[in-house]
């Protein structure tokens, strides 16, 4: 069992990284393999809606997005973590997720998703909601904790002082592990749900 963790902060050793390290520690204790991918400090451009991925199965911009796609395919869960910028996720992470989710044609149903947000003070709820939308449009169950998954701190290292926030992300990792294992057992016994066909429509027709 494996989880891919995305660090959307430009700081490889900041508070977002610390929150992810706490989750990785729990996953290791639970026997879950982890891979932490540093996203926020990379030059990632946004989607240009060229449609190339519909023909080739990968993004036309051959960068870390395509490199992460295979890890995402093999993973049982995905954690997207970001600092809060103007009540939103880091734009680099947003560009990464837009392209990752749109360009990958493999079935993401029942992979477990979770988001973690880090802020000095406010904007956590809006950012948390923003990141979770990638999961809920993809048939991915969203793992939760005993509180919304936010950690507070400004200067690197301050997140360690947010004892409630750290407990929140550690419990998130425990709940996520349970959910991944439960889904694996369910798939083994019952298989995936057989979905109704979908006919895409516009609001004008």
Residue ranges of predicted features:
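N-terminal beta1-alpha1 ligand-phosphate binding loop
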Residues: 2-30
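A short beta-strand-loop structural module common to alpha/beta enzyme folds
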Residues: 32-42
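Cysteine-cluster motifs in flexible loop/terminal segments that predominantly coordinate metals
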Residues: 42-72, 199-205
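Short, hinge-like loop/turn segments at secondary-structure boundaries
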Residues: 51-55, 132, 161-163
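Helix-loop-strand module that forms the ligand-binding subsite of alpha/beta enzymes
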Residues: 60-147
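Glycine-rich phosphate/pyrophosphate-binding loop and the adjoining helix
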Residues: 141-205
